[in-house]
Amino acid sequence: FGSGKSHLLKMLSHILGEVPAELVDKGNKPTMSREQIVHTFMGKAESQDDQMLAGQLEKALTIPATSILFNIDQKADKSNASDMLLYAFVRVFDEARGFYGKNPYVAKFERDLASNGYFEDFKQEFEQVAGKPWSEGRGEAVLWDDEICEAYAAVTGKPEQDSIIQRYEDTYTMTVGDFA
C-alpha cells in the first residue's frame, strides 16, 4: 500500500494514449493534454541526459491511442468471482465505445448492430417505435422486446423475429481469447 502503483499507471496511461474526458473519474479532469504531459517528461529525461527515453517518449506521441482509466473495484461484478476481471474489462471497453456495459449481452447486440452498420439507424427507429431513446430503453431491454424486434426488422430489412435480446442472453459467452 502507498507505493505509488496507481499513480504510475495513471501517468503511463496519459503518456501512452489520450484519456477521453468522459472516462476520467469525476473531479479529476485532466488539466494537460497528452502532448503537454509527454513534453514535460521529455524535458525531465533530457535534463538527466537520457536521450533514449526522451526519444521513446517522442515516438509514443506518433502512435494514436486511447487510454481507458477505471477503478476495477467499482466496475467488477463481485457475484462472478471466477471471471470478475474479464467482465470488468469487457464492461469498461464496451462503455468506452458507447455500448451498454452494464449488460454484456445487450452490449453484444449493440456491437453486432454497429459492426454491420445498423446501430445508429436502430437507435432512431427504436425511439420512433418505443417513444423513448435507446439509451434509456436498453437498460430495460426485456420490457421492450416487441419494439426492439420491430426496430431491428425495420433497419435490417429482415423478417421480424421474437426475443432477439433473449437469444443474445441465452447464447452470450465471453472468454479471455474472445476479448483479446
Residue ranges of predicted features:
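P-loop NTPase motor core
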Residues: 2, 7-141
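Conserved helicase/translocase P-loop NTPase motor core
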Residues: 145-180
